[in-house]
A protein has these predicted regions:
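Motif-centric detector for short Cys/His coordination patterns
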Residues: 1-105
Length: 105
């Protein structure tokens, strides 16, 4: 369950569905400002069921847990790719701080 995106500058990133889901830019996940993020739990097995283009600047990802309100701009996706290692570690750290163990297969 990986989405691969190639950008015009030659950069190519692979994103797990879980990573994209827990970093959804929707207000229900990202909040309405810094510090208002909502920690997403139990998304280890989430999959993308549809990718809908939004103009020439974004895609709407539809996940099998019925989350579909995030518009992922290509700029945001690029940033998620560049910062993937640090952002993933931050997510794991926040899970641990919340006392949640991520399921591994």
């Amino acid at each position: 369950r990986v989405l691969e995106i190639s950008f015009d500058d030659g950069q190519r990133f692979e994103y797990t569905c879980e990573y994209l889901r827990v970093y959804s830019p929707s207000a229900e996940v990202a909040g309405h400002g810094p510090g208002q993020e909502v920690l997403q739990l139990g998304k280890e097995d989430v999959s993308i069921t549809a990718i809908d283009p939004v103009g020439n600047y974004a895609v709407r990802l539809v996940f099998d847990d019925n989350h579909d309100s995030g518009l992922y701009s290509f700029e945001y996706l690029y940033d998620l790719g560049v910062k993937q290692t640090a952002k993933w570690q931050d997510y794991l750290d926040r899970l641990a701080a919340a006392g949640h163990k991520r399921r591994t297969h």
